[in-house]
Amino acid sequence: TEFFSWRISMTILGGICLFCAFGFLKLLPNSRNFIAQQGLSFKFHLHAWYAHLSHIRLLKIYGIGFLLTSVFVTLFNYVTFRLFAAPYHLSQTQISLIFLSYSLGIISSSIAGNIADRIGKKQMMILGFSCMLLGVLLTLSASLFLIILGIGCVTTGFFIAHAIASSRVGELATSSKGHATSLYLLFYYLGSSIVGAYGGNIWQSHGWNGIVILNIFLILIALIVIFSIKPLHSPSVTH
């Protein structure tokens, strides 16, 4: 929107989305193992969701998903306001380029599984949140370089922890895996919606230091939850 109206920008984005959707439709291979189930009642869905929510290890993973997006979205939502203001006065285009740090997620999430096979998934999630904690602390600096480096660390840690947490859902749920995954995504987006919005109050009242304190608090809660997760020894959810 720095060079065009918001209408033109949205039209361009819409066109890109349509192009990607068409490519997805044409290039995605057919499912090999999917078997459609007929006659599933609403009661069945409620029972499946309740069973997953009643399982403490799955519930902790859902909480981790909530905390992940809470930190990630809150940081990205309000760091833009900080960089628009003095002493940085970055333009919309310059700030948008910082979001290229998302590409770090392609690398970190790809290698997370291989490293987790060697050191363990619990340790990998701890590593991911520790990386996020380091990144959040780096954004306290007045140096633009360190702020951007901090954003990169948060992004890397986020995708590491998310890749491991989401894979744990499939491992812990031995049946109705689609229901288990849908609950993870529900908590995942609730974090970005609730805490991401609440962060605006923190930003207005306490500035960037308040955002940092909020994110540190959330990361510490996540680490406590991760440490409390017991190893998987037996099937977790049965119907």
List each model region and its residues:
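Helix-to-loop junctions at the C-terminal end of transmembrane segments
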Residues: 107-120, 203-204
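C-terminal membrane-cytosol helix-exit motif in multi-pass small-molecule transporters
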Residues: 9, 14-36, 225-229
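C-terminal transmembrane helical hairpin of 12-TM major facilitator-type secondary transporters
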Residues: 120-165
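Flexible cytoplasmic inter-helical loops of multi-pass small-molecule transporters
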Residues: 25-51, 237-239
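Pair of pore-lining "gating" transmembrane helices in MFS-fold secondary transporters
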Residues: 54-75, 152-156
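A late C-terminal transmembrane helix in Major Facilitator Superfamily
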Residues: 171-208, 214-215
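A membrane-interface helix-boundary motif in multi-pass transporters
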Residues: 2-15, 199-219
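Loop-to-transmembrane helix entry
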Residues: 86-104, 179-183, 213
